[in-house]
Amino acid sequence: FTDYEMETWFQQYHRALENEYTRYQNYWWFYALTEQYGLDAYSRIWRESAYPEDAYQTFMRLYLANDLNAFYDALYRYASHAVTFDFAAAAPYSAAWQGRYDATLYDVGDGWQRIAYASCPEANGFSAIPLDHQGANRVTVSFRGLQPGSALAADDPGLYYIGDEATPENLTGHTRIYNAVDAAPGWRYGFVAYLTDGTRVYSDVCAEDEGAVSFDIPEETQYLYFVVLGAPESYQVHVWDNDESMDAQMPFEIRVEWRK
């Protein structure tokens, strides 16, 4: 944990695993990888890669028999743990960094909120939406996946980066639609609760394009998140082109209901 890298991470965490804008901050995946598959998993990916694979295609081949659904299951597990830094190596330090994830959504009517362009999960990236659960014992989130290329919410400025870093001076692009992708869209989503004693509680994961999921909120929940992973039906290789508008996005909208 360092202040500089972490602040950048919280601003850019929704991006694809190999996105150029998080090339120095996207290290939490490797904590999840080595914790689940052993310390040598990291070195095996580099030593046993085969052209034209990227690192995650090599991971799928070595550990998941090239099963894309298993890959997304592994990525959702990683994302849901990353939201509270639930990794053994991070345990001594993670308490000070709780409650920092955020995502922007815009109202689109009838209680629905649409994910902002600037928070939309890219292919194999995730969004962590904090939920204000005070006084409630059950939450239901209705989910609707949107087609890539769909219109942004009316209030969404639709600004994007053009340049080699995600810095304010490079926030010069403008769009009124989400980025398109040459693949059918897909998602994984569910809940994560962080309790006051540091315990984490995870819901089951859902993969429906449209549906409603509920979660009984544990007592002593301090932070509650709805986590959405971008999981298109075919693997998307991420190209370093310094143009955010070319990055595959998996947009969605949600409606949140509480029971007290």
Model-derived features with residue positions:
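Acidic/His/Gly-enriched intrinsically disordered linker/tail segments
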Residues: 1-36, 40, 46-83
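Beta/coil-rich, acidic/histidine-enriched accessory regions frequently appended to metallopeptidases
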Residues: 51-260
